[in-house]
Amino acid sequence: MNLANKLTLLRVILVPFFAFFMLSGDIVPYSYLWAAIIFAVASITDTADGKIARKYNMVTNFGKFLDPLADKVLVVTALICFVELGWASAWVTAIIVAREFVVSGIRLIAAGSEKKTVIAASIWGKLKTASTMVAICVIIIMHILVDFGAITAEAFPVQLISDILMYISCILTTVSGIKYLWDYREVLKTDA
């Protein structure tokens, strides 16, 4: 297994530790800080694995499969933790998670089609990813600040900001999902 794939695999391995610290705020001191550090390391591996794979000609089918899967597992885990903690609405999270499954399904169908179509990320998909990652990071940081007493949830609109960020992510997620369905409807018709 090459270095790029090891970094991708590390991201998957970090997910349960991230979830543990996110959900152990009552037991582990500074658990949100630890979760943020793990999320940051996982995010860095996401950038590093692709750059290393391309620069050193380490692109593999395993990496092409595992990299987007690792991203989805990390983001979906964060969003589920947010719902459990009351930081995000279940319906917003459900829309984001459903879109991930739908687009992944479209990609699998396209890749398995006669034309072996590879679906690249669209600008809407990139905006969706960026908005979701920003939302996750900002929401965790706000709760770290509350945890450390730097701000209070009563004086600072933590939940309102969290909701706005998640709604923006949800809107971009919905637009992106509809665009994928529209752009690749022929692939779906052919293989349905």
Residue ranges of model-derived segments:
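Alpha-helical transmembrane bundles and membrane-interface segments of multipass inner-membrane proteins
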Residues: 1-192
